[in-house]
Amino acid sequence: ESLEMKPDTDYELNLLEYTKALKWDKRTGCDYYWALMRSKQLIIFSFCSFNDYNSGIIKKFLFFLSFALHYTINALFFTESNLHQIYEDEGKYNFSYQSPKILLSALISIVILRIMLQTLILADKDILEVKYQQTKNEAIDLKRKKLKCMKIKFAIFFILNFILLVLFWYYLTCFNAVYENTQVYLIENSFVSFGFSLFYPIIINLAPTILRVSSLNSDNKNQICLYKTSQIIQLI
């Protein structure tokens, strides 16, 4: 009943439009906006378990699955901002989420995410194996070698990410938006959101590892400080 009432202020008008946007697709009974939000929450939840070495393969698979879900929804329906425009004209329901280019970008994102996950697991596994060394000097030398190898892995991964983002931007520019006045906005918003979300797990995993390795060459006080800093980064 409240939705049928005429809004008295601009604030109520915006609230009314926002509410309609969240429920724009009543025919399928799906709320893609909240589906996207839930996938983001699942990613945040998975970050905690992924950095736990004792979490097991099931939780690590959950980490990958949440990313695949997130980027598939993002590629098919772009960002949640797009939903704020669709309700304006339900007659133009020919939304191009079935475009082969968008589906292809979703598949590419999943493939790259699989590479990312494997890279992170191998890097963390290589660093973790050092704890079985018998002397501290051997552990330090081995960790330096492993860290150098890990940097090479991440350099390759950054190049792959750059190629992916260029391809993703190309697909978006080739995409004929239903609403021409929002096409540029959708491209910019989707590109920034996609890029930030893709590089965030690298930061959250690489930074703590570097801090842990750096703490080996410091005294006990600095070592504790660096280790706590790495834990804080993981929590963030």
Feature locations, PLM:
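Extramembranous, membrane-proximal N-terminal regions and early juxtamembrane loops
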Residues: 1-236
